[in-house]
Structure formats: C-alpha cells, structure tokens
Amino acid sequence: MSEDRRIIEKYAALSPYQASTPIKEVLADPLIKDFARFLFPDDWYAPERYTLASVDHLLPFHSHLRLETTLAVIEKVRELRRLKAEVYYPLGKRVGLFYFPSSTANPFSVISAGGGFSYVGSIHESLPHALVLSELGYPTFALQYRSGGARMAVEDLALALATIFEDPARFGLENLHYTLWGGSAGARMAAYLGSYGTESFGQKACPRADAVIMEYTGHTDYSAHDPATFAVVGKQDGIASWRTMARRLERLRALQIPTEFHAYERLGHGFGLGIGTSAEGWIMDAIRFVEKNVGKF
C-alpha cells in the first residue's frame, strides 16, 4: 500500500459521512460551514440531489475521483476545526488559502488545483495532496482562486505567496523555503510563478520557489531561472500531451536545471493523487525528488 493511500484511508475511515450524504449536508456542517463551499467547485451549481458520490459530476476535466479521498479531505478539515485551528484564510471574496499545518520546521508547499480556469477542483487535486504532505511533516497551503482566466488565477497565487511572506509567523512557519505544486491549469500557475516570480504578477518580490511539481499540463513556457521541476502525466491524456511535457523538461535539462519526468501507461487527464492507477505513489517520488535536489524541503 502506498503511503498516500494509507493516509487517505485512515482519514476516510473516521468520517461520519458516506456516499449517500448530500453535498448540502456537508456545506451546512457547523464545524466547516464558513468555508465549506470552497471544498467543491463553487462556480458550478450542484443540484440538491447531488451526494458525495456525485462529486465527479462537478469536475468534468478530472478523472479517477475516489469517495475515500473526498471523505478524507472533509474529515481532515473537520479535525482541524475541532482543534480550533484556522483552516481557511480569506484573501478576497473568492480567493483564499486552506492551510494544513505540520509540527515540523520543514519548508512549506503551495498547491493549485486545475479546472481549465472555469472551476477549481480542490477536492481532488490540491486538498488531498495537502493532506498527505502535512501528514508527512510538510506544512501545506491549497489555493482557492478566481476562475475566468490564467492571468487572474496567477495573480491570485502571487497574492497568496505575498501574504504568506508578509507574516510567516501567522502560520507558524519557521522555514521559508517552499515548493509550488499544481495540476493542469494549476500546474501552469505554479510554472509561471516558478519562472517569473511574484513581482511579475502585481506583488512585491518574494523568494523564489525551490521546486515546481507539475501534473499533466500543456504548458510550454520556461526561463533560464526555472527551479528544479518534477512532472507527471498519463500517456493517454487527450488534453495535455505527455510529449509536450517531456520536451519542456528536456529544454530545462539543457539549462542544467534538475528535472524528473514520469509518463504513466493506461492513464488519462486529471488523475489527482492517482490512487488505484498506474501513477499511484507519484507524490512520494515527488518528495524524494525535491529532497534530493534542493535539500530537506
């Protein structure tokens, strides 16, 4: 069993919810109701009949959604609220940071889910990753950003980083090295910030990321100043070609930038953690990559 699967199943087993639980019941949960709508894509209306087994209908660009992962994420934020932790930090009307703290002084991570810039698939593509990373000792943020276009979304990520660096003690951060993670549209966001920094997107200059971790994106832009880059994609991805990702990393390697690339068989777009697929365990490979190339991140 992969370590990420073990963590997800542990939290899923603690959940009071199940497949038949209406999404509206989760939204009304007294522990998390102040921010629960951002657990799910808030750009698309969820019919009242939708249950937690229907979440995949809200994420049309994603695949391999698992009920256990959804339950685990919800239980994690409920646990944090029971401990009186502040889970969601609003940065604007529809912009904010979920924060899963850790007890160690490891560098932190910021994760942006994808959704084609038409919705934010956090329940599948950033919050599960944040849960796993935090359980492994890495403080992790998951970004809620505005949909409607890449520029707007990247500006929201820059705002999030500027907010973190403005007062890191607010989040209990001791180590200010960090990594940027993202899936699909979120990977584009991470790559842009990794290449050009917050100062290129309306914020003061912040320290650059130590590494970028990318899932399945057709992003081709890069710079000579890119950080170490790890990328994963399915070979049957009809949205983001694995060859496009491979070529970008080849260009980074030519600049002596550390890279690692994985293309998985029998797998399409939007697989998230990839539990139950040929990509299962990729997040552990990503952690090892960063630790090898930029130290104990």
Model region roles, listed by residue range:
Residues 159-226:
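Primarily recognizes the serine-hydrolase "nucleophile elbow" in alpha/beta-hydrolase
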Residues 238-247:
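Conserved alpha/beta-hydrolase "acid-adjacent" motif
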Residues 2-18, 255-297:
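C-terminal catalytic histidine-bearing segment of alpha/beta-hydrolase fold enzymes
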Residues 123-141:
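Short amphipathic alpha-helix adjacent to the substrate-entry channel of hydrolases
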Residues 34, 40-104, 196:
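N-terminal cap/lid segment of alpha/beta-hydrolase-fold proteins
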Residues 106-115:
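Short beta-strand element of the alpha/beta-hydrolase
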Residues 231-233, 237:
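Short beta-strand/loop motif that positions the catalytic acidic residue
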Residues 121-123, 142-172, 274-279:
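Catalytic nucleophile-loop/oxyanion-hole region of alpha/beta-hydrolase
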